[in-house]
Amino acid sequence: MSKSHAAYIDYALRRTTNMPVEMMGTDVVRLKDYQHFVARVFLGLDSMHSLLLFHETGVGKTMTTVYILKHLKDIYTNWAIILLVKKALIEDPWMNTILRYAPEITKDCIFINYDDQNFRNKFFTNIKTINSKSRICVIIDECHNFISKSLIKEDGKIRPTRSVYNFLSKTIALKNHKMICLSATPIVNSVQEFTMLVNLLRPGSLQHQSLFENKRLVDEKELVSKLGGLCSYIVNNEFSIFDDVEGSASFAKKTVLMRYVNMSKKQEEIYQKAKLAEIKTGISSFRILRRMATTFTFDSFPERQNRDPGEYAQEIATLYNDFKNSLRDREFSKSALDTFKKGELLKGDASAADISLFTELKEKSVKFIDVCLGILASHGKCLVFEPFVNQSGIEILLLYFKVFGISNIEFSSRTKDTRIKAVAEFNQESNTNGECIKTCVFSSSGGEGISFFSINDIFILDMTWNEASLRQIVGRAIRLNSHVLTPPERRYVNVHFIMARLSNGMPTVDEDLFEIIQSKSKEFVQLFRVFKHTSLEWIHANEKDFSPIDNESGWKTLVSRAIDLSSKKNITNKLIEGTNIWYSNSNRLMSINRGFKGVDGRVYDVDGNYLHDMPDNPVIKIHDGKLIYIF
């Protein structure tokens, strides 16, 4: 039915031919073609009640949305605008962008942060104050977070955000309101998030049905047919976060580097104690204690089970202060720092004080030592992602930075009052090469809504639970024109994944998480393809054979059709002759996968999903006695 959707897109564009391409307030900005396109379609179809902006980081989702809000009154006089956002993002980018380009809509805007514990009450209180003659436009920024907070927990408890989700899914279309959801990563943790998002945008269209069988979509054609026009899809980088990507005129080159570091005997001893503690307390599935132990270890492992919280906190504070005091008035000599900046380690002729300090620091954290050496050897500015703030996280890392003489800012929950200003200073043109501030270390608080410019190296000290979060992290530094001020030879970003291993080189929890991420991504890639093929851009570019229409009366019927996956008509069992193979998507063999090559040259993954045809002259490497095809 994409031809039908194409006809409505064409109708919307014909209705909005005179819509200005510039947005003017206290400042003026000219929209990119893709921004102007999606705004014209959404505003040109008044009965298009909802839309997902699946736009990668840095291409201007916020700007596109503000333009749409500015022109809402082109289609109706009275609007109330409700923006559901994280608290950290209200001032910047939202309020700043509105005040700069559409100050006249400020009086119509209501900001509510969905991470507020009173979110539900605040939302419905504001709904009651809206004039009955006004239409409502709801904006949900980083909608994957809103969806995640609306999922029913495993214990069956309904979360407060769910009532807002239910209200929006029932009311937006019914009352002729509008809604825009924004995300660069619309699916993060589970397939259920896709179902929730679809039913928010197209209420009731995707009922309780299994989307996958043996990790393959049951009926991709049915989903694409019924969900046409669901989203706008602007994703220039469709590669895995673990793949290298060549640069372009607008985007920096990305190179992924896996840095494997072996723990010291002392660190491994604490790691094993952390593993036992997880088993005893029943939290081994979360791997938190082991993840912390791979990052940094004190001289002893503080047991938490069956202890008074205050007593435990006091022990942690004592261990931290002891370590901090051990570094008082100690730092590396200029000679040692010069050696590190050349990418070299201390030699035998180094001072005893430098060697002793380096040995002590490395015994407690091979990761922190490695990241400090990497920063000093970097030719430009650096980002460091460390999800833990206290105990063995950022608080300790900053002590390492001090000893290594690394200037830095911190973006975390500890710096709420100063972090926006600090990032602005870090991004200043005068700091393009990191002369004033070399590094920004950030926690999960910095994964969304902020931009960094002229970054050359990103160090990821701990794996997240999903590729989407990693994509958000890396996307902070590789954005549209993020390196425009950087010298041409430094328009690149090296992404370093620092993976701890046991002292004998055996894997740790870091590689467990790496495998979990790869497993999840198999299903997500297929759902992202559905988003792409149901997008306004894809339909407009690929569907040309349609009959023009002169009204939008049939749009609601077109997008209200229920999705039926019960027939499973695209699942067929077929025996294929061929041979088992090994393959990798990386020249550095970061991950090696089992696959199958049919006699016809088609290559499949271990679950039978078709990948691509075997090249005429494939690249092959030998690793551990295996022939590895590089695709």
UniProtKB/Swiss-Prot annotation:
GO terms, molecular function: ATP binding; ribonucleoside triphosphate phosphatase activity
Superkingdom per UniProt: Viruses
Annotated GO biological process: DNA-templated transcription
Keyword Hydrolase: yes
Stored Pfam families: Helicase_C, NPHI_C, SNF2-rel_dom
Motif DEXH box per record, residues: 141-144
Catalysed transformations (reactions): a ribonucleoside 5'-triphosphate + H2O = a ribonucleoside 5'-diphosphate + phosphate + H(+)
InterPro entries noted in UniProt: Helicase_ATP-bd, Helicase_C-like, NPHI_C, P-loop_NTPase, SNF2_N
Span of domain Helicase C-terminal: 367-532
EC number(s) recorded for this UniProt protein: 3.6.1.15
UniProt keyword annotation of Electron transport present: no
Gene3D superfamilies xref list: P-loop containing nucleotide triphosphate hydrolases (3.40.50.300)
Domain Helicase ATP-binding: 42-204
Alphabetically ordered keywords of this record: ATP-binding, Hydrolase, Late protein, Nucleotide-binding, Transcription
Binding site for ATP: H55, E56, T57, G58, V59, G60, K61, T62
UniProt function note: Serves two roles in transcription; it acts in concert with viral termination factor/capping enzyme to catalyze release of UUUUUNU-containing nascent RNA from the elongation complex, and it acts by itself as a polymerase elongation factor to facilitate readthrough of intrinsic pause sites.
Subunit composition and interactions: Monomer.
Protein family: Belongs to the helicase family. NPH I subfamily.
Protein name, entry field: Nucleoside triphosphatase I
Gene source species: Vaccinia virus (strain Ankara) (VACV)
